[in-house]
Amino acid sequence: MKITSRKVVVIGTGFVGTSIAYSMINQGLVNELVLIDVNQDKAEGEALDLLDGISWAQENVIVRAGNYKDCENADIVVITAGVNQKPGQSRLDLVNTNAKIMRSIVTQVMDSGFDGIFVIASNPVDILTYVAWETSGLDQSRIVGTGTTLDTTRFRKELATKLEIDPRSVHGYIIGEHGDSEVAVWSHTTIGGKPILEFIVKNKKIGLEDLSNLSNKVKNAAYEIIDKKQATYYGIGMSTARIVKAILNNEQVILPVSAYLRGEYGQEGVFTGVPSVVNQNGVREIIELNIDAYEMKQFEKSVSQLKEVIESIK
């Protein structure tokens, strides 16, 4: 698919949707940004607020509230709409309500004649990415969930903070569900190219126990933020904007998005967070890491949980 207008539609103007819009404008990613919400006044108000800062943006951008007809010639439709996760809830607790919302939204988008790429940020994202694909009838590669992009940035940030190293020099992934069953891939985590398990032998700032604690901290990061401020949105806003950038610029970059497995990691028939090459066509291919036996077992458990939920909402 060739990117033509750099037009992006964001559906859902809550905290996440507006954070994504704000991030895209500040990074100069789009030429036209359309906001859609069930509350038209909210969408119009957010568009006006964003427009007030356009003179300070990198590029002049058309920002407006719209409707589903605007999806027809959009390059990307980002969906963030849904019920928010509340304190004490897991992301999977949201599934039934948000699956109905997702089906309704995707149906209306496709009725417009949309022929671009979907980016899904609504939770539980792996399940709702599957629902979006199933409803749209598009090829799986054109439905991209945010997956574990946010978890991965949290992972790198926490490890970098512990080691007092720039996060950009830390490489590693969280894979599987964006949620409680996610898996830290320590077997492929490196610091400046050096495997983490080799690195900690000579580094007294971190030990094996710290690695386990760090994984748990990353897994529970959203709960901590929700307890303190009721919602998470800046991190996922920037993470989603990064995916949009990769698509619009045809980057061929590897990001841990929620992608459809066709036998990779011994799994199929499910969307989940795995390192994937992202370009203007969505997911070009999945990078299959040779993870260790423990990580594979945890990944299989994560995928199994997702499949159970998918079966329950069919």
Swiss-Prot record:
Record flagged with keyword Oxidoreductase: yes
Keywords: Allosteric enzyme, Cytoplasm, NAD, Oxidoreductase, Phosphoprotein
PROSITE patterns according to UniProt: L_LDH
EC number: 1.1.1.27
Catalytic activity: (S)-lactate + NAD(+) = pyruvate + NADH + H(+)
Activity regulation remarks: Allosterically activated by fructose 1,6-bisphosphate (FBP).
Function noted in UniProt: Catalyzes the conversion of lactate to pyruvate.
This protein's name: L-lactate dehydrogenase
Organism: Lactococcus lactis subsp. cremoris (strain NZ9000)
Classification of source organism: Bacteria, Bacillati, Bacillota, Bacilli, Lactobacillales
Protein's gene: ldh
